[in-house]
Amino acid sequence: MMQQEQTFTIINKLGLHARAAAKFVTTAAEFQSDILVRRDGREVNGKSIMGVMMLAAAKGTEITVRADGNDADAALSAIGRLIDDYFGEGQ
């Protein structure tokens, strides 16, 4: 089993609001690895929309994503691409 961790900065204008959180959870759910997201000492399940929304990660917020499992690398890469793409919102 592999464990990977990476810190990302939320760059889209609206932060991790409902639609972005839904895309995050949908992406995380594509992988078998457990996905945990941490912000300011609070850690939530990255496959739980309520958990991800509770982080209230606004633009400029740093989140740390940890993936535990055989596809941990791929999971973090996919989540990183989603964040870098502004969650598909264009800004």
Where are each of the predicted segments found?
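Compact, glycine-rich, soluble single-domain proteins
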Residues: 9-50, 54-59
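C-terminal structural segments of small proteins and small subunits
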Residues: 58-91
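SAM-dependent methyltransferases
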Residues: 1-2, 91
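Generic detection of intrinsically disordered/low-complexity segments and helix-coil linkers/edges
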Residues: 2, 18, 25, 80-81
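Intrinsic-disorder/low-complexity, polar/charged segments enriched in Ser/Thr/Lys/Arg/Asp/Glu/Gln
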Residues: 3-7, 62-64
